[in-house]
Amino acid sequence: MAATAWGIRSSGIRGASPVMSACVSPAEVILGADHQQQMYCHLLCGLRRWDAVDCIRAPYAAALARALRLLQSKWRQLCDDLECGTVCADVVTDAAMRGAVQDGVLAGPCPELAGRVRRICERDDWRGVLRQLWPDARYISCVTTGTMEQYFPAIKHFAGEALPVLGTDYLASECAIGINLERTSPPEETTYVLLPRAAYFEFIPFDMDAAGRGAAAAEPVDIAGVEAGKTYELVATTFRGLYRYKVGDVVKIAGFHHSSPRLQFVTRAPPPQEHGEVLTERDVMAAMDTFQLMLKDGGEVIEFAAFIIDGDGGQRRRRCATIAVEVSNGSKLLDHERSAAFLRRCTAPLEGCLGGAYRLSRATGDVAPLEVAVVRPGTFDRLAEAAIRGGAPANQYKPPRSSGTGTSSMCCNPPWCAAAAQSLNQLLTSICLIVSLNQRQFLDRESNSGTDKVFISDSILNFQHWGGFSLRFDLQEESLTLYKDHPS
């Protein structure tokens, strides 16, 4: 989805931006620099102007899920602000943003409205809470396919049965690709009718062979050469000058609408250097669905990411797959003594969800046993904030899902890799427990002179990572040290 401020800054016939006039938040909030403060102000403005909200929109489901988590954690403060008619300076430090909301939207205390919001939010069950807060809302609209699919159940829970969650069209930064003719379909059934005149599209046949390695045919086919049921990597030649550009998406031809193919998103295509990797986004998502079922009432999976660290040829000759999981605050998994045994029981079923490529690599000994890491609550939100501060557009940020090796970026946003390159570092420094099939454990970290050490039960490796920081596994002291710069 292309990122542009044209729709917000441009003026319509009457001199006002058509996009800005459709929002309940003032321009100072929409164009603000701090994402967390923006979300808080959006929620506050939406609650104050509750009778003017007729739909809830977000570019991606991940952004809407973050806003809902903020509503869950800050609803009491939001009610206090509504009751007093002020914006808490500790939460919103941006003076322009705070002043615009306080003077232009709140316009004085609203004790009755604050009481109404309190009565709705103080319930234990938040099913259908969005419909109760905004009874005139007709629908929720956001991207819920691909890696966004994991957020759909939570959003649907908050929306309830009476408030539909609609899918959006298939838009990329390079060009428009397809339109969604059945917007009420659940993510797993969503298809897009290709727009044949939006660009010149070609399709590279894509196959996950017996080893799970992406195998692409040398010659692409055009729109007339695709076959229903086959999987392809999408290529576009655009009117703006991109020639045979690989969009990076793998799609399945679900059928045809008249003569236009109906596309079903499958996964992101692995980068060229990672063809042959053992983890795909869909594999990891399937594993996390299983993990959530195993948790039952022991907590909720908030976010997750998977990465593979290469062996060094020494003590650790094999690559190691790790899935970092953030669970809801108060989860039993945050209790080390109770969770270690549970995680060990989980690793074997999770390995069974990781696809043929991973299972083959495990059988041949190329990959070490799976490690499941529990990171501290809020880790992925801090990761998002770091990426946004580093230049990632807030409305386009996608949480990392999987990376092939320890020498590649975990984040799905190539233009701002400088910030994304620190994602593995931030995940590792937030780890409170890692358990694998071979009984290795990473316990609480301790900070000392700018380095973070995670004590482990056996020695692993010494290995340097991306530019800007490195990892050193001390084989004698049985400790792991993360350096912000390469150690001497």
Curated annotation (Swiss-Prot):
The gene is GH3.6. Expressed in roots and callus. Induction: At low level by auxin. It is an enzyme of class 6 (ligase). It comes from Oryza sativa subsp. japonica. InterPro entries: GH3, GH3_C, GH3_M. This is Probable indole-3-acetic acid-amido synthetase GH3.6. The keyword Signal does not apply. Its EC number is 6.3.2.-.
